[in-house]
């Protein structure tokens, strides 16, 4: 029987032995190449050159250095065989000159080949006792050497060769056959080395169409090879097997047979598993397949739905109470539940992937059939499955056990009918998990415990709004967040005093002004400053104009000497010159709409322009215009904060006899632009008598004084702030300015 002798060729042919070098009885001097596999009946056989594997005959001994035509002609059978290449004496010397090869004493390629033939099999019987390697008294004469010093002769390669083929028929006589054979084609390969000993039997195919022409039978000294046609070879084999079909094998039939054989082999091995488990003392669980047809009531047609396969696992010792376990986590993540067949099991599963198309004609939409149940750790309202509805219950929880208690298919169908008529009022949740994470429960009769409870309780809790809006207002934590943010922010600002009053006014919740102080009493004091009639008229006219036509107040570096001053509690800017000089780098130019001419005292470093129409200089800027917006603010401002307001000075006309001296004094004070002291603005005397501003001739009043009928500040001066909303807008703008 021919056997492969070259491991290199086997290494490059993982799926087939075609192209491997074979020999008879491990005789490396008579080798050939396994061309292809043919099918004779139901058996498969390898095809190669017959003269290479036929039983050899004894040939006369030839000297190693005799490589002449006379020596080769001694084995010739006729004049037609003089051009046939025969280097059969030593396969290691093929296409080489023996005299040109020099071997070292330690070379592994040195092989002593005795050309004298003692028997037909070229095998010399050696007694076991004569072997030196088994003699303990004889030392090993081999010397060590580096692996790269060893000379390896290239021999018997299985790489494919390319060339051109001539369609010319001829007869060729081979010495070993003693007859002539038909050779239909002759090919001339394009390779560095010509065909050597052992290449007989190599298959020749077309490089473009993969058509098999035949196999190599001989070669000549010119490097040309002779091919035996495959058709003639199959006809010769058919003559020896009249009742069998001889042809090249069909790959599809072979693969189908291999798959069937593998399936049967695996089935036999799995059938022996229970016996092996019993031998180990274990109780195996039998596995079988059960088909369930998803049918509901008569109004629903599920004839187009295929059958669902799932594995039912039961224990041998509990036949009456069988358990159906859910599928483990070995399922793929891209599983989709549609109308294709789904097989559920612990080890063998066939899943429909997400990219497989589903015909719309075989799908009937029915809402409320498929339901999605979330795990208890993440409760959420369920939603119907997208696409085609499947009458099965879906669960994402693992480790849950369901009991069947002998349910028949009729009971299962009635249960599915109830599922089809279930309540569909549950709203779909767009944030719910995708159904690709779900698993089909093997048993559909028993619903998962707590499914309805989890869904209803979660949904009702999401929609419950029993709290009163007033309670929500009381629980509002926005002011506290503002308080914390501003408290941490003012620790980083260079001027922390600017935010102290602002944060207290914006974030305090519980302080309110008592009702008895809603409308403050305004009285004139005997020591009020008296101005001239011209000044009184100008002040009255200006206040009326501001009440009728609110203008845009510009806050910038103020140069007017008669502007309204700021409270002295905030660091005053004192100057002995005639004008106010403020560092322009420390403030920002801002313009905002406001219907009042009064500004909060916490706005340090800014002074509004004088309301008079005189030729006093005004500060003009290109700033942001921020009109006030009506934003409600429920909190109150501390009552101990005072704000000065203009007084109707027209009632002071009768006091002209005292006005001359007072006016001169006041003009002198205003031109000098002296900042009022804290005692003059916020006196510590009687609270019922509002103090008077010595700089702008105004009376201070409580800013939190509210009227009972309207939600406005109880300030009669028409040119001042008239709503708490405007105050909040002003404070919000100041906070943004200080932060940014």
Swiss-Prot record:
Give the pathway annotation.
Mycotoxin biosynthesis
**Compositionally biased residues, Basic and acidic residues:** 656-667
Q: Which UniProt keywords apply?
A: Virulence
Q: Which Pfam families match?
A: GATA_AreA
In residue numbers, the region (Disordered) covers 353-391, 414-434, 514-535, 656-686
Keyword Ubl conjugation, does the record have it?
no
Signal peptide span: none
The record's section on InterPro entries has: AreA_GATA
- Record keywords: Ribonucleoprotein included? no
- According to the UniProt entry, which residue ranges have a biased composition of type Polar residues? 668-682
Q: What does this protein do?
A: Part of the gene cluster that mediates the biosynthesis of gramillins A and B, bicyclic lipopeptides that induce cell death in maize leaves but not in wheat leaves. The nonribosomal peptide synthetase GRA1 incorporates respectively a glutamic adic (Glu), a leucine (Leu), a serine (Ser), a hydroxyglutamine (HOGln), a 2-amino decanoic acid, and 2 cysteins (CysB and CysA). The biosynthesis of 2-amino decanoic acid incorporated in gramillins could be initiated by a fatty acid synthase composed of the alpha and beta subunits FGSG_00036 and FGSG_11656.
Indicate what this protein is called per its UniProt record. Gramillins biosynthetic cluster protein FGSG_11657
